[in-house]
Each structure stands twice: as structure tokens, then as C-alpha cells.
Amino acid sequence: AFDSIMDPIMGFISDNTRSTWGRRRQYVFWGALLMGFAFAMLWQLYRENSVAYNFTYVMVWSFVFYLGLTIFGVPYVSMGYEMSDDYHERTSVMAISQWIGQWAWVIAPWFWVIMYDPAWFPSADEATRSLSIWVAVVFTLCAIAPAVFIKGESTKDRSDYEPLDFRGILGSINKIAKNFVEAFSSPPFRKLCIATFLIFNGFNTVASFTYFVIRSHLFNGAAPGVWPTLFGSVGAIVTTFIVIPIVARMAKTMGKKR
């Protein structure tokens, strides 16, 4: 719900920003910093605190994190599409972006092994607090890289942009609502939305039960060791090195629609 409100607002702000830095870079930079800081703070939890306190703490920092994600993510995606006017080159840009992003799914499952290894950390609680800081620092640096290295044209003197005020933001939301109703009246668009909904929700639902399926059905409830980690990591490696290049190639040769 928070994203559904903030994303179109952030899109309007980014699209109509007048700046010597362009429309995207500054938001990618500051959004990455906010997101990284909030991620590190989000996991600084202690068992001795009350359930109500920890719940409130996580909820507040989650909102801050997703605010940073919105500030970063909306301009970042737009920046990727604006890097080229060529139809197929944009496909290559998005494929490379997805390829790099998949490495998070290759690496992240191994955190479970590190967290519960006493040679690394005395407890999983301490591991969570420490790892969150390291992850935040490393990936914040990665996230600000597009803002530093991808150059954008100055929009300081653009006169065709709408003013960044409350009336302009409210008007953009009304336009988005009208465009959504118009787009959703198209049968192909509805099919695409339904397919996307089923695919993403199906994937996330099944993925959340993976550990329990492996432990219950393969190990009869015993500790599964590194097998859940291998399942997630190997699956991500297959996607990274096989699926993404093949799909990108098919999109160029057969067309995205087919």
C-alpha cells in the first residue's frame, strides 16, 4: 500500500525535476544512502526488548527502508531505459541489470550458513546485527554507482516540465488513475496483469516454503545442513548464467511479445 502511493509520486517528481544533475542521478544517490542506512538499522534488534517495542521498531524502519527504495528504485529503472534509444539495446541493458541483480540470490543463501557457524559469530542474533551493517555498506556503494558513473543531461532550463508542488503531484495521481482505468479496459493488458500477479505470487509463496519442504520431506524433520542454501544458490546460478542470456537472445531474435 505504501509503495502504491509513493511510486507514482516519486515518478512525477523525478520526471519533472529541473537540475544540472538531470532528473535521476541525485535521487538514485540519496535513495541508496537512505535505503542502506535503514537496512542496517532495521536489523539492530535485541531479545531483551519487548515484543511491542521490536514490532514498532521494525515497522518504522521498514517504512524508512521502503521510502529509500522508492526514491532509489523509480529513477533507477527510468535511468536504465533512458540509456539508449535503440529497441534491442535497451533489452541488453535490462538483461545485464537482471544478471547483476541475480547475484544477490546466489550469495544471500550462504548467510544462513555463516550466521549459525560459531566460528563466525557466537549467536545468530549477533550475526544478524553485524551482517546487516556489512551488507548495507557494500550494497550501498554498489547502489550509488549508477548515480556516479552514468551521466545525464542537465534539465535546469527545461520549461516544459510541470511544477513540483502539491497541485502538480495531485494532478499526476489523477492522470495515473485515469490511465490505469483506460489501460485495464484492454483485454491483452488485463491478461498481462493477471499473468504477472500469478507468477510473482506463486513464486514468492512456493519460495517461502522451500526450507520446510526440504527439511520435512528430504530429512524427516532433521537439520538439513547446507542443502536449503545449495537449493537457492544453485537455482540462482542457473538463472544467472543460463536463463537470462537465453531469454535476452530470444527477445532479440523472436521479439519481446512472442
Task: List each model region and its residues.
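Membrane-embedded alpha-helical bundles of multi-pass transporters/translocases
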Residues: 1-258
